[in-house]
Swiss-Prot record:
Domain spans labelled MIF4G: 36-264
Example of a GO cellular component annotation carried by this entry: commitment complex
Protein name listed in UniProt: Nuclear cap-binding protein complex subunit 1
Molecular-function annotations in GO: mRNA binding; RNA cap binding
Compartments it resides in: Nucleus; Cytoplasm, Perinuclear region
Length: 861
């Protein structure tokens, strides 16, 4: 116990109170504040308990009716909470609307205040659509997306309004979208498509509580007829945005093309589809007068106001920015992979498009609360009619059995729908709306919440992408690799590797096979994500243990590299150790001199003199120059590896030593009579040779040498794309590819690099493509087909001496496609130059035609 004295113990000391520290009195929370602390969380979670929903509506509405209008604190807290739910958790809008209408029927002042507040919010966001000073936060979905969500909420409140009040807003928005669309009759206008699609998607919500209003139905039919007649949906096919090369596993569907048919189908047959989608809460709805109107007409921005904003390229919010390029539906869970039924509500239905829209809004607007997003997306079904989805966690085997017994039984899985939509955000081209880490960790959270239900869903997605690796976009392979590796590292590196054994056995001898390289990169990435080598090793069957070698170049090449530095001296293989300085190993002739150099690198900045280093190098030359084949090259390698070794504890240490010693290195290197390009190539070769077993660190250390002014990005690219025989690590090694993207991205914000690295990388890749085509020995007018092989085929059926060359060709072509798309703004400026020279640059016709098309498309992405 705490051995505290009782009050009586102080009775003898009458003055003890004078010395007791004076504590401030505990502040009493005002009743209205306490009420808000209890009530607002209940509003935010409304509808999450189906059983308590009716009671929640009753109790919350009574509290609001009684309290609204008395205290500004309560009024403001209520309105801001309602707004937060409406724009951050759109699946709950109908519940909030029901609550609002029940309140309105008994306290019209409160009801009117709520609709006025949301109308003002709508007007506020309309003004923000053309505000050049608009600042977007990470969870900002955009002004137009906010307009969509607020209009949807007001639409659910249709029983409160005169019919024309809402119809006029719809009409104005459609008129604006049509005017914007007509600004450029030959090309898509992103903002026009966003307004058109968003507004159409809201129309069925007018009938949520108002399904028997014939006047409303007539007005909506007239509105849809007007839109269909006056809005031209433009055909867009941007190959750069295709997720697959060649034949995709599913039809590419553009959201703007399906929204009107989806809405029309939802409204026919006496709203049959809506009756199956929306829950029937009319028994909870209290009578509404239906005569409400807004105080003012909504003022939309004019076409002139919006002319500089129609491309949606000003970073006005994550969802609004998605419309910058055509928006396609993304699929993972196809019917033929699960049986003769679908587990995801088709995008060709109103429900499918709406669910897709809601999940995206949830994921984007609640980005600041990832744990909440993980919970919400899997419980989306609570806010729609029961029976649309199967029971959570039901396996595909159970579904197949149920479906065979009863073809009318539900087969849609909320888990599949949520995961597929989030994967669509991860695999979105040309860029993603949030950092990848957010999406990856969100999926980890979802799986951790219910691993038995979600793990099989992930497994089916892993298998889907793996089965299409031959045609999956080059950049998307890297995203798939990242996602897969992060999921595995969070779940004990558990995977059914035996499923891939046949592919490894049959294609392991090929350098460019996509599936073998994926497995290799995956295992090596797993090793980088853990310090426990055996944890990964123990998870692998024997066939895959050969991929545990993380070396950038093979061991024999590494030995030859060091041997090339000497004449009359043989390098002992045991002396070449992983991530260690070879030159200080016991038995290496200049070991003691090298230790002097290492002592020099560790000296404090104010106690180092470069003349001391020069003296040590002079000593080295005098004593060992006779066994060194090229002393200039040797000095560069030795000094670079000595500095690299000194900073090998961490990247921060590497940066420190490189920055501390950069001037000394520059002084020494300046006296070496080699051209700059040769010196730089020797530097990066020395770095990657030291870090051969950990090339990711090697490339990051090379970046540090670049920032120190000892290296350029161009030399890094030259090294990465150097070929040994037909083998080019820069095309298949994930860390090298990441280094290419990283250095190109860095140049966008750097002005210190001379020359155009974007042009250099493009031309280097085209050169690799041309040499590969020459080796394939195809005619100029002959197409090259993606190899159609798999691990189930007999080995005799797939013998093809040019199989690896074909994979190499499609790898390098995919790389070209990725850089043109990823850096479209930079390549747009080079487009005319490329096109003018492309006939000579790329002789092969179909390759030239494909790349020419991509170059032209950079203007559209």
């Amino acid at each position: 116990m705490f051995n505290r004295k009782r009050r009586g113990d102080f009775d003898e000391d009458e003055n003890y109170r004078d010395f007791r520290p004076r504590m401030p009195k505990r502040q009493r929370i005002p009743p209205v504040v306490q009420l808000c602390k209890e009530m607002m969380p209940d509003i935010r979670t409304i509808g999450e308990s189906v059983k308590a929903f009716e009671d929640d509506i009753k109790f919350l509405s009574e509290a609001i009716m009684n309290e609204y209008g008395h205290e500004d604190y309560f009024n403001n807290a209520l309105l801001s909470t309602l707004n937060a739910v409406v724009v951050e958790q759109p699946q709950k809008q109908a519940a909030i609307a029901l609550l609002t209408m029940v309140v309105n029927s008994k306290n019209n002042v409160a009801g009117k205040s709520i609709i006025n507040y949301f109308f003002e919010e709508l007007q506020k966001w309309c003004k923000q659509t053309y505000n050049d000073e608009f600042k977007s936060t990470s969870n900002e979905t955009g002004p137009w997306n906010k307009i969509k969500l607020i209009l949807r909420f007001l639409s659910i409140l249709s029983p409160m309004f005169l019919v024309d009040e809402l119809i006029n807003i719809y009409k104005s928005l459609f008129e604006l979208s049509i005017e914007l669309n007509n600004l450029d009759p030959g090309n898509r206008v992103p903002l026009s498509e966003a307004i058109y699609t968003n507004t159409l998607l809201n129309i069925p919500y007018l009938f949520f509580f108002n399904r028997n209003n014939d006047g409303l139905r007539t007005k909506v039919e007239e509105l849809l007829a007007y839109v269909e007649q006056n809005y031209l949906v433009k055909t867009t096919d941007i190959n750069l945005l295709r997720e697959y090369n060649g034949e995709p596993p599913y039809e590419m569907v553009e959201l703007v093309r399906v929204v009107l048919p989806n809405v029309k189908k939802a409204l026919i047959n006496n709203l049959e589809q809506l009756n199956e989608l929306f829950p029937d809460w009319n028994h909870l709805l209290t009578p509404q007068t239906g005569d409400e109107g807004f105080n003012d007409a909504l003022t939309l921005p004019s076409v002139d106001d919006l002319k500089s904003f129609v491309r949606l390229n000003k970073n006005f919010g994550s969802v609004d920015s998605m419309w910058k390029t055509p928006r396609y539906a993304f699929h993972v869970y196809l019917p033929n992979s699960a049986g003769n039924f679908e587990t995801v509500v088709p995008i060709s239905t109103y429900a499918g498009q709406l669910f897709n829209d809601i999940i995206i809004d949830l994921v984007e607007s609640l980005e600041f609360n990832r744990k909440e997003v993980a919970r919400q997306v899997i419980t989306l079904d609570l806010f729609f009619k029961a029976g649309i989805f199967t029971e959570p966690g039901e396996s595909i085997a159970q579904l197949i059995a149920t479906y065979e017994e009863n073809p009318l039984a539900p087969t849609f899985k909320i888990e599949d729908l949520a995961i597929e939509t989030i994967l669509g955000l991860i695999f979105k081209l040309p860029s993603v709306s949030q950092p990848f880490a957010y999406f990856y960790t969100l999926l980890v959270d979802i799986c951790q919440n219910s691993p038995k239900a979600i793990a099989p869903v992930f497994g089916r997605a892993f298998r889907f992408f793996y089965s299409h690796l031959d045609s999956l976009d080059f950049e998307l392979k890297l995203r798939y690799l990242d996602w897969f590796s992060i999921q595995m590292s969070n779940f004990n590196f558990s995977w059914k590797w035996n499923e891939w054994e046949d592919d490894s056995i049959k294609f392991g001898k090929y350098f460019y096979n996509p599936k073998v390289n994926f497995a290799k990169n995956l295992i090596q990435k797993e090793l980088r994500l853990t310090s426990n080598f055996s944890e990964v090793e123990d998870s692998l069957p024997q066939e895959f243990t050969k991929y545990l070698d993380t070396s950038y170049i093979p061991r024999d090449q590494l030995i030859n590299y060091y041997q090339s530095l000497f004449t009359g001296y043989t390098v002992e293989e045991d002396s070449v150790r992983k991530n260690d300085l070879y030159f200080r190993q016991e038995g290496v002739p200049m070991e003691n001199t090298v230790r002097k150099i290492l002592d020099y690198t560790h000296k404090a900045n104010n106690s180092r003199e470069v003349t001391e280093l020069e003296s040590i190098l002079g000593e080295l030359k005098n004593e060992y120059g006779s066994i060194i084949s090229d002393f200039n090259r040797f000095v560069i390698i030795l000094l670079v590896q000595a500095v690299t070794d000194s900073g090998s504890r961490s990247l921060s240490h590497a940066n420190k030593y490189i920055n501390d010693l950069k001037e000394d290195l520059k002084t020494i290197f300046a006296k070496i009579e080699l051209d700059i390009e040769t010196k730089e190539y020797i530097i990066i070769e020395a770095v990657l040779t030291f870090w051969n077993a950990n090339p990711q660190t090697g490339f990051l250390v090379a970046d540090a040498f670049k920032y120190a002014g000892l290296l350029t990005s161009r030399t890094i690219f030259t090294f990465i794309f150097n070929e040994t025989g037909l083998k080019n690590n820069g095309l298949i090694e994930a860390t090298a590819i990441e280094a290419v993207f990283r250095n190109l991205s860095q140049q966008i914000s750097e002005e210190n690099e001379s020359g155009n690295n974007f042009e250099f990388v493009f031309e280097r890749l085209c050169t690799i493509a041309n040499s590969t085509i020459d080796l394939l020995d195809v005619n100029a007018d002959e197409d090259i087909e993606i190899p159609k092989v798999n691990g189930e085929m007999d080995i005799d059926d797939i013998e093809d001496d040019k199989l690896d060359l074909k994979w190499k060709y499609f790898t390098v072509i995919g790389f070209i496609k990725s850089i043109l798309r990823r850096y479209s703004h930079e390549y747009r400026e080079l487009a005319d130059k490329f096109i003018a020279n492309i006939d000579n640059a790329i002789p092969h016709e179909s390759t030239r035609r494909t790349i020419s098309n991509w170059i032209q498309e950079t203007k559209e992405v």
